[in-house]
Regions:
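Minor-groove-contacting beta-hairpin "wing" of winged helix-turn-helix DNA-binding domains
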Residues: 165-173
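Winged-helix-like regulatory helical subdomains adjacent to P-loop NTPase cores
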Residues: 38-41, 53-145, 193-194
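Short, amphipathic alpha-helical interaction segments positioned at domain boundaries
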Residues: 94, 174-194
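Helix-loop-helix "sensor" segment of P-loop NTPases
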Residues: 1-49, 71-74
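Short, hydrophobic-biased segments on the C-terminal half of alpha helices
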Residues: 147-151
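A short, conserved structural fragment
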Residues: 154-164
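Alpha-helical DNA-recognition elements
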Residues: 64, 152-155
């Protein structure tokens, strides 16, 4: 991760936020229209959820899907095709995901891993459920501590608030959640924080 941090620090920094849903859909559909490549509506919806409309991750996913289209010579891609390429895209985007991770404090990392585990289990990602999971893992922390970590990650656009009034949080780019599940251990991060 240090290598990537050095590499990314030699370039000019430009904040790249997420695209609005309409612009993200156009980025998916318009470049391949002249090649007769069509995405199923469910595939486009899945692409938007996985990438959060972030142009970098959206481009990686489109790249993987166009490669699939070229290999299999199909003009219609489905949600199953998107699902089958997600692991590849996590690998392609690992440097950026690792950089976001390395720029997070150990406390933020603990919250990220707890949230990833909760969401993967179909549980709501609230401050209370995050606190409960961290406590089960041996890290008893206050809600204020969790709120501060979440607030910082919302400002950095790693996390976003879920539906209004639910108190839930989710990953802005769901690929981050998948990467965390594959490559990081909540137990090890909890030990570091303690």
């Amino acid at each position: 991760a240090e290598y990537w941090s050095i590499l990314f620090n030699i370039a000019l920094y430009r904040r790249v936020g997420t695209l609005d849903p309409g612009a993200a859909r156009r980025l998916i559909i318009e470049p391949v229209r002249s090649y007769s490549l069509v995405y199923d509506d469910l595939a486009v919806d899945k692409m938007l959820r996985a990438t959060g409309g972030h142009p970098y991750f959206l481009q990686l996913l489109c790249y993987a899907l166009v490669n699939l289209h070229n290999r299999e010579r199909r003009n219609y891609l489905t949600i199953e095709d998107v699902n089958s390429t997600v692991a590849e895209v996590v690998g392609l985007g690992e440097a950026q995901l690792a950089l976001l991770w390395s720029e997070s404090t150990p406390e933020e990392q603990a919250v990220l891993l707890a949230l990833a585990r909760l969401l993967s289990a179909g549980e709501p990602g609230t401050q209370a459920t995050i606190a409960g999971l961290l406590e089960e893992s041996g890290l008893g922390v206050s809600r204020a501590w969790i709120a501060e970590a979440i607030s910082k990650m919302v400002r950095r656009e790693i996390l976003q608030r879920g539906e209004q009034g639910t108190g839930r949080y989710e990953f802005t780019v769901d690929l981050m959640r998948l990467w965390l599940e594959e490559s990081k251990s909540l137990g090890l991060v909890v030990e570091e924080v303690m």
